[in-house]
């Protein structure tokens, strides 16, 4: 059974329809990236999946018992608030130090447990958010522009870490990004969204799709130069451009 199934989903805010007739699935262990221009409905789609936005039509079905880890687009913490990484990770649920350490290790920042949140660099902060999302051993990670504010090397390092997380934990990943040249290389499937699904498939299929090039131009073809994903598992998702 698919982890997440979205069927004919439409989302409206007042009279404004931001998503219409969107359909997609997320299968166990795969990395799916949603790309699209600003205002294309990417964040609204994630909100509908986690129940933070009510569909105007269609439905979202989660596999029974599905555990979701969520890494938000941004999170502001008052710099004057004295809070350690360990305390931050236990704010919303009771967790042991061992759980914190295990999650931080998977996120490749095992030495930050006692560090003040206000002292973290941008990259360290995002990895702590990743560790917090991993602490309950999710079946799927949802990432909403999780590298916003990082420079290109920092973003690339973060997405490489996401691949490592998938290999180590087996969890699926559904992520939103505008950094096409980086995330293309880390994805099993790419879904191009602009209020509806323009095209979907492997990075190679999507990068050559007319719908994708109409939105992003031909210059993004360089994304495929980074397409170094070497699978040790199979997904039957080389599907054609969607209407």
Curated annotation (Swiss-Prot):
Every ABC transporter domain range: 4-219
Reaction(s) catalysed (UniProt annotation): Zn(2+)(out) + ATP(in) + H2O(in) = Zn(2+)(in) + ADP(in) + phosphate(in) + H(+)(in)
BP terms from Gene Ontology: response to zinc ion
A molecular function (GO) term: ABC-type zinc transporter activity
Residues that, per the record, bind ATP: 36-43
Keyword tags: ATP-binding, Cell inner membrane, Cell membrane, Ion transport, Membrane, Nucleotide-binding, Translocase, Transport, Zinc, Zinc transport
Gene3D superfamilies membership: P-loop containing nucleotide triphosphate hydrolases
Gene Ontology cellular component list: plasma membrane
Membrane topology: Peripheral membrane protein
EC number: 7.2.2.20
Presence of keyword Chloroplast: no
Subcellular location: Cell inner membrane
CDD domains attached to this UniProt entry: ABC_Metallic_Cations
Keyword Cell membrane listed: yes
Record field: transmembrane: none
Broad enzyme group: translocase
PANTHER family found in the cross-reference section: METAL TRANSPORT SYSTEM ATP-BINDING PROTEIN TM_0124-RELATED, ZINC IMPORT ATP-BINDING PROTEIN ZNUC
Family: Belongs to the ABC transporter superfamily. Zinc importer (TC 3.A.1.15.5) family.
Entry function: Part of the ABC transporter complex ZnuABC involved in zinc import. Responsible for energy coupling to the transport system.
Subunit composition and interactions: The complex is composed of two ATP-binding proteins (ZnuC), two transmembrane proteins (ZnuB) and a solute-binding protein (ZnuA).
Designated name of the protein: Zinc import ATP-binding protein ZnuC
Organism: Jannaschia sp. (strain CCS1)
